[in-house]
């Protein structure tokens, strides 16, 4: 499934294409997509395919096409502080993007059938926290993953504000999914080859809307134990953050706000991700001449075409010159502020989430 937009050269290029095709429509979703490099969730040797609008599968590891994830993120209408459940959380790519929007006071849970994929997701999550330049630019709701079949969730489990299911849902499982949703919540899942948004408007009332034609593998049916019944799966607890963690969140937030105020006072704009300049397409002006009794179009270069060619050459030269300049190391102002605080080194390390950069 996918192929709706052109392939990108890198993550930013892919996001530009998704925006241009109207799959990404809101700034909040765009920021989350730019912050998480899709290529980081591919196995070594397969990264070249990361920026194509195509699904990817290797063994139990699976990523949906970027256009699908874009529609899902937009349809969920995420807000800070909400609770989210990802049914079939896979590599954790979607859950990590969701966590950037939910912020530190949200709930971010995922359930995945394959234990090796859960381990893969945890490794990718740890790598994002430790190594990504984007981590310090957001307040993050870290996903918690459990192994299990999403059709075996314990009946006394809590409900969620937002739910996504990444596998095809049969009609007879639709109500099971709906019960997991809070009143006022949104559930996005594929039903009968349609990605569907379901809103719970009351205790027993729902509104549904088809978003996109899709093709998903169906949910795996649960296996039964010796008693002939499937074992139930417990979801992660909705834990309250401790005071130490809350202090870290608020210290980092205060420093980040201070940095933003400083930059505004100096007239320094917040750095936006680089956008690629697309070459303008050369257009032709046609003249028409009669040949016998037929009117034949004859292409004629316009002055505007010549100017476009000159502009494109100038842009290529400028891009080449920029590429030849030595890259400046990225500046992490939040880290710099933390390291200047009059605190023991162990506390500074805690405030930086033990990141090395």
From Swiss-Prot:
Basic and acidic residues composition bias: residue spans: 318-333
Record-level Gene Ontology MF annotations: protein-L-isoaspartate (D-aspartate) O-methyltransferase activity; ubiquitin-like ligase-substrate adaptor activity
Region of interest (Disordered), ranges: 299-333
Chain positions covered by the region annotation BC-box: 240-250
Lipidation feature positions (N-myristoyl glycine): 2
SUPFAM superfamilies in UniProt: S-adenosyl-L-methionine-dependent methyltransferases (SSF53335)
Entry-linked InterPro entries: PCMT, SAM-dependent_MTases_sf
Bilayer topology term: Lipid-anchor
The keyword Protein biosynthesis is assigned to this record: no
Gene Ontology terms: biological process: protein ubiquitination
Annotated stretches, region: CUL-box: 341-344
Residues at the catalytic site: 64
PANTHER family referenced in this protein's UniProt entry, alphabetically: PROTEIN-L-ISOASPARTATE O-METHYLTRANSFERASE (PTHR11579), PROTEIN-L-ISOASPARTATE O-METHYLTRANSFERASE DOMAIN-CONTAINING PROTEIN 1 (PTHR11579:SF4)
Family: Belongs to the methyltransferase superfamily. L-isoaspartyl/D-aspartyl protein methyltransferase family.
Name this protein carries in UniProt: Protein-L-isoaspartate O-methyltransferase domain-containing protein 1
Organism: Homo sapiens
């Amino acid at each position: 499934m996918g192929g709706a937009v052109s392939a990108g050269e890198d993550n930013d290029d892919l996001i530009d294409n998704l925006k241009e095709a109207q799959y990404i429509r809101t700034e909040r979703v765009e920021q989350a997509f730019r912050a998480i490099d899709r290529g980081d969730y591919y196995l070594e040797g397969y990264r070249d395919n990361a920026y194509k609008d195509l699904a990817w599968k290797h063994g139990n590891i699976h990523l949906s096409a970027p256009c699908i994830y874009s529609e899902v993120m937009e349809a969920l209408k995420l807000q800070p502080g909400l609770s989210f459940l990802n049914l079939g959380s896979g590599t954790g790519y979607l859950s990590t993007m969701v966590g950037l929007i939910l912020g530190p006071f949200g709930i971010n849970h995922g359930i995945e059938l394959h234990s090796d994929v859960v381990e893969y997701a945890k490794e990718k999550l740890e790598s994002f926290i430790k190594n990504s330049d984007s981590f310090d630019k957001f307040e993050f709701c870290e996903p918690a993953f459990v192994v299990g079949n999403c059709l075996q969730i314990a009946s006394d489990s809590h409900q969620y504000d937002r739910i996504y299911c990444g596998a095809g849902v049969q009609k007879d499982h639709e109500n099971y999914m709906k019960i997991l949703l809070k009143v006022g919540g949104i559930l996005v899942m594929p039903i009968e080859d349609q990605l569907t948004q379901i809103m719970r408007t009351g205790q027993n009332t729902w509104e549904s809307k088809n978003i996109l034609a899709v093709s998903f593998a169906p949910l795996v049916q649960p296996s039964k134990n010796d008693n002939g019944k499937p074992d139930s799966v417990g979801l992660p607890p909705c834990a309250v953050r401790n005071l130490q963690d809350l202090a870290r969140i608020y210290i980092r937030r205060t420093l980040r706000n201070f940095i933003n105020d400083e930059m505004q006072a100096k007239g320094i704009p917040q750095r936006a991700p680089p956008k690629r300049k697309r070459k303008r397409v050369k257009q032709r002006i046609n003249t028409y001449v009669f040949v016998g009794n037929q009117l034949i179009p004859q292409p004629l270069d316009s002055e505007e075409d010549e100017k476009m060619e000159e502009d494109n050459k100038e842009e290529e030269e400028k891009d080449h010159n920029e590429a030849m300049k030595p890259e400046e190391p990225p500046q992490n102002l939040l880290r710099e502020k933390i390291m200047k605080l009059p605190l023991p080194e162990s506390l500074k390390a805690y405030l930086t989430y033990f990141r090395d950069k």
